Amino acid sequence: MTTFEEFESPSTSFNFQTFDRYQPDFKMIDYSHQQATHEYHLPDQEVFQNQNEFSASPPDISSPFADEKIYKSLPRNKCPSKCLVCRNPAIGYHYDVPSCNGCKTFFRRTIITGRKFTCAKQKKCMDGTEPVDMSKRLCRACRFAKCVEVGMNPMAIQAEVKTDEGKVLRSEVLNQRESLGVVSSLIVTEEDLLSRMIEKLTFVESKVEPLHRSGMPPGYRDIRKLEEILDSKPVLVVTDIPNLKFCPSPCANEKRPRRHFTNYVHTSYLASLESSKMFEFSSQLDLESRILLMKHATLICSNMMNAFFSINEMKSDILRHPDGSMSGHMRKFDRENDVMTDHVKLIQKTLITFLNHKVDKIEYLLFKAIMLCNPAVPGLDSWNQEIIEKERNQYVKALLNYCLLQHGKLQGPTRFATILAMAPIIENQSKNQKDFHVYIKAKHFQKHKKMGTTFRKCISCMFDQIMET
């Protein structure tokens, strides 16, 4: 068993008291202007208007479980939650807008007939946030005005407008749409915002996954410290890591050269660190706060990534490295050590939890973002805690909405609670792995002290900084 190869910190705090509505300007850092050789641009809301930036097909959100429902990334592939006109449950997209059957029919009939209505009150009959009482007679003037305001497109009506009044009204609506700047594709619903957040997280994951897969070349070591990694621009390819050091020399008292293996532990940690730098909130934190946060979150995110990769990519029910080798494989004499045996079982906990609850990729991405943004890490000041908590609340709200869309209003909250209940298991695994690291470090030091040297092999400086907190 490789002594430092498999290796978790303060308790996780969730704030469910208030959830602000999604921020339309939610975005992640664009590093494309800093590094010309790689594209790191993460699309914000404006970029989504450009169909050339992203194809119409949703990102890969496959899961190893064939019987689950998959939420399509594109909003039009999922029935919207409410009508934008009357705020009652919608039945689909009609004339480019999420709407109910009543409002759809009313808009079509009004355009075809060309009828015009007058409000007897103050033209505020459709104002408010609560669903309109459909059992009462609605103000037709305000209802039609609301249809136009939210972006219903008269040109999408298939029935022919034969009357002169209808043609005049259609022309007026089109002119009004232009003056209001109404663009139907920009109407933002909660489903649209969730889809955009999912696509952004999927994009980040796709950028760091090659780094996670590659592993450090045998014999090479990344000599950078944690603060150097966090304070530099993203490095998503192993060959771009600055100051790679080749360490071929074995211990002085060994009779034969030490066999070198691909170091997947370091690149797994590195993938978690590099992905964190792509979130906009990271740039709002000072370097000291980022170091504190990532000393806590790196191992957690790495464990989650390793577990989901083993399930989804390797189709395995045990933890495996990207080359297919078993993670935590013990040598013959290690099997007689209860501490080693318990550790091998320990590192499987996150994977077993994901398997038991059939976590799909979107749940994994959102949950990992929640675990990354932990304002309860000791040492953070109130200003930085507020930034992190605000970011976390967005992901918590997104996960809740996703669970409601996938499992309905009855089972959705239960599924949401089930996913969040995995947090203590993952946190405890991280803490126990760090305790094991201290045990191995002391044992290794004692061994080499008896040999007359304090030489100690380590995976990397960054690894030691994270594991020794």
Curated annotation (Swiss-Prot):
Signal peptide: none
Any one GO BP annotation for this protein: response to starvation
Keywords linked to the UniProt accession: DNA-binding, Metal-binding, Nucleus, Receptor, Transcription, Transcription regulation, Zinc, Zinc-finger
DNA-binding region residue numbers: 80-159
Zinc fingers classed as NR C4-type: ranges: 83-103, 119-142
InterPro entries: HNF4-like_DBD, NHR-like_dom_sf, Nucl_hrmn_rcpt_lig-bd, Nuclear_hormone_rcpt_NR2, Znf_hrmn_rcpt, Znf_NHR/GATA
Domain NR LBD: 230-459
Claim: Cell inner membrane is one of the keywords in the record: no
Annotated localization: Nucleus
GO molecular function: nuclear receptor activity; RNA polymerase II cis-regulatory region sequence-specific DNA binding; zinc ion binding
Gene Ontology CC annotations of this record: nucleus
Protein's job: Orphan nuclear receptor.
Family annotation (PANTHER family): NUCLEAR HORMONE RECEPTOR (PTHR24083)
Family: Belongs to the nuclear hormone receptor family.
Protein name: Nuclear hormone receptor family member nhr-154
Native species: Caenorhabditis elegans
The encoding gene: nhr-154
